[in-house]
């Protein structure tokens, strides 16, 4: 079988931005082969080896005021992303296409470039589908998000 991967630059976007325009954080793409079995993952710089989830609480993402939004770094269409609330399984999270909130924040508020270059950065942002969202049914409830990759590895975030 053949798999194609788009790999982010370890330096971020064009050596300047801490994040690529598709939302992939600075990092390295690790490919491992053992006895003919292949596995891979994206390792974010400055984060734990098993960190794959970036979570924004309600109100932190424009247009998603009522939602917790999750980015799954290294995602492909074989991942499962589920959640529980106060220990009760709520099933699969809703998958959404969006521009990366961190990249857009960087372009709008942190990048210190000329107007022409900033416009180029804005245009380089791409809609991606490695985002999921949930809406709590109980205010201030305890949320657990569990993402399982194609290899059966589980990654968890708690709010």
Language-model features: locations:
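Binuclear metal-dependent phosphoesterase catalytic core
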Residues: 2-75, 79-86, 120, 124-158
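Solvent-exposed serine/threonine-rich low-complexity stretches and specific carbohydrate-binding patches
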Residues: 89-122
């Amino acid at each position: 079988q053949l798999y194609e991967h788009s790999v982010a630059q370890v330096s971020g976007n064009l050596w300047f931005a801490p994040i690529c325009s598709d939302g992939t954080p600075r990092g390295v793409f690790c490919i491992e082969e053992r006895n003919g079995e292949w596995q891979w993952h994206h390792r974010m710089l400055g984060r734990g080896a098993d960190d794959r989830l970036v979570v924004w609480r309600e109100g932190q993402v424009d247009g998603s005021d009522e939602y917790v939004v999750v980015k799954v770094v290294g995602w492909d269409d074989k991942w499962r992303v589920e959640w529980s609330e106060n220990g009760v399984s709520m099933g699969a999270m809703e998958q959404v296409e969006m521009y990366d909130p961190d990249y857009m924040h960087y372009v709008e508020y942190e990048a210190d470039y000329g107007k022409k270059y900033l416009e180029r950065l804005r245009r380089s942002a791409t809609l991606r589908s490695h985002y999921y969202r949930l809406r709590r049914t109980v205010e201030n409830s305890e949320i657990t998000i569990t993402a399982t990759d194609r290899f059966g590895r589980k990654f968890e975030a708690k709010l």
